Amino acid sequence: MVRQLILISSLLAAVAVRAAPADPAHPMVTEAPDVNLVEKRATTCTFSGSEGASKASKSKTSCSTIYLSDVAVPSGTTLDLSDLNDGTHVIFQGETTFGYEEWEGPLVRVSGTDITVEGESDAVLNGDGSRWWDGEGGNGGKTKPKFFYAHDLTSSTIKSIYIENSPVQVFSIDGSTDLTMTDITVDNTDGDTDDLAANTDGFDIGESTYITITGAEIYNQDDCVAINSGENIYFSASVCSGGHGLSIGSVGGRDDNTVKNVTFYDVNVLKSQQAIRIKTIYGDTGSVSEVTYHEIAFSDATDYGIVIEQNYDDTSKTPTTGVPITDFVLENIVGTCEDDDCTEVYIACGDGSCSDWTWTGVSVTGGSVSDDCLNVPSGISCDL
């Protein structure tokens, strides 16, 4: 009888062991997880100080979130965040600085798919451009590094970035698709002193499609935006001050010389050389089509209000027809020139190479009226 009770008790205990959940202190052995799933787990990395750039560049593919905190990038070195893993999130904190050296740059490079780059509220990328500024920009003098290469980005976002005192051009956007940039600030106002800063373009765009830039504030000494090639580009709700306004081109002389379906909307252009400009290269080929400027306000333009030139690189020559400008729309454009030294509207087209233009609600005052416009399209006038 005792043996039977012991046997029954043992059987019940065995069943209980099988049915009971595993003891947390002694977990049950489970099948090893798939290696690919482990690789996808979130890893947060923080890099800072003088070794931060080097460590970030070496370890970037091990991190899904990268914090760059008060990084001091050594001279002649790129903060290289190219070829990031899909979905990587990059966050700037504090002040990012760059050592001095005469070289072409860039100071920062980012590429990848589904990338997010952003700055925290106190973050600043400080180029300390006065160390390079000599009044010559990229045309001579010291060799100056370009600032930020947003090249080969796909389905990505750059937001809330504050850049101060770039040595020369700021954002180069090239080979990118479906890139959104919001709340970008470039403050190069220190370069206005003695006209020392030059060629400090805010956004240079080439060979890219579906680029959207909104909420930008650009204070610089060259084009706020220059679209050299690309399609489906949208720039809106922004301020451009002190530079060369909203530009298409120069178009011509590159591997890709097509600009198509571009919209500038709701932009204020202040104290700039001109507000609206299309520039194509004499003797070259390409095309500019479906470009719209809508709801643009500008004040105190110094050289031109609106300027279209098909001989941009040599205005002494008769404009050529190799880069036609078609389907060009200006709608609700209101602005002022600083004084009579500013030409309100200037158009220099090749014979028959500017067509299908529609201008409505365009008003430019305070400057002089040009008598030298060439081949003005039907329905358009240089005397508004």
Swiss-Prot record:
List of glycosylated residues: 261
PbH1 repeats: 176-207, 208-229, 254-280, 288-310
Enzyme Commission number(s): 3.2.1.15
Active site: 222 (proton donor), 244
Cysteine disulfide links: 45-63, 224-240, 349-354, 373-382
Propeptide feature: residues: 20-40
Chief site of localization: secreted
Entry keyword set: Cell wall biogenesis/degradation, Disulfide bond, Glycoprotein, Glycosidase, Hydrolase, Repeat, Secreted, Signal, Zymogen
One MF term in the entry's GO annotations: polygalacturonase activity
Uppermost EC category: hydrolase
Signal peptide as annotated in the record: 1-19
Any Gene Ontology biological process: cell wall organization
One GO cellular component term noted in the UniProt record for this chain: extracellular region
Record flagged with keyword Cell wall biogenesis/degradation: yes
The keyword Lipoprotein is annotated on this UniProt entry: no
InterPro entries to which the protein is assigned, alphabetical: Glyco_hydro_28, Glycosyl_hydrlase_28, PbH1, Pectin_lyas_fold, Pectin_lyase_fold/virulence
Homology family: Belongs to the glycosyl hydrolase 28 family.
Role of this protein: Involved in maceration and soft-rotting of plant tissue. Hydrolyzes the 1,4-alpha glycosidic bonds of de-esterified pectate in the smooth region of the plant cell wall.
Protein name, per record: Probable endopolygalacturonase C
Native source organism of the sequence: Aspergillus niger (strain ATCC MYA-4892 / CBS 513.88 / FGSC A1513)
